[in-house]
Amino acid sequence: SMGGYVSLVASASVAVAGVFLMAPALYIPSWQHQQYPSRAAHIEIVHGWADDVIPVQHSIDFARTAECDLHLIPGDHPLNTSIARVEAIFSGFLERVRSSPQTSNSPGKAGESAPR
């Protein structure tokens, strides 16, 4: 959650090929950043439907705004019961990032892609 927040905030300043977020702690009222621009060409989120730490709606809202992939899977915050599923999703993410002709060197909003 906190790692997802930090990764996404950092990706606004550092060019990265992709950001993989697990139940990211977004839209927390007392935190400094409430908007999340990113230079990452690929952003993907995994969030458990039964998460009682970070509201799943926060990931849904961000995915809609950023136009990124969102995987809502069975499980709570740590997703301990869905590790094989998370591994499969992450492997697919890595393959898409590796095979993408897009670059992450141009600034843009989250989810913005270079033309193919």
Feature-to-residue mapping (PLM):
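Short beta-strand/loop motif that positions the catalytic acidic residue
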Residues: 39, 44-47, 51
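A conserved short beta-strand
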Residues: 15-27
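Acidic catalytic loop of the alpha/beta-hydrolase fold
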Residues: 28, 49-54, 78
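Gly/Ala-rich beta-loop-alpha elbow adjacent to hydrolase catalytic centers
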Residues: 1-7
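Post-His helix in hydrolase/transferase enzymes
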Residues: 81-95
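Histidine-bearing beta->alpha loop at or near hydrolase active sites
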Residues: 73-79
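Short alpha-helix in the alpha/beta-hydrolase fold that links the catalytic acid
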Residues: 55-63
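Conserved serine/cysteine hydrolase catalytic core
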Residues: 29-42
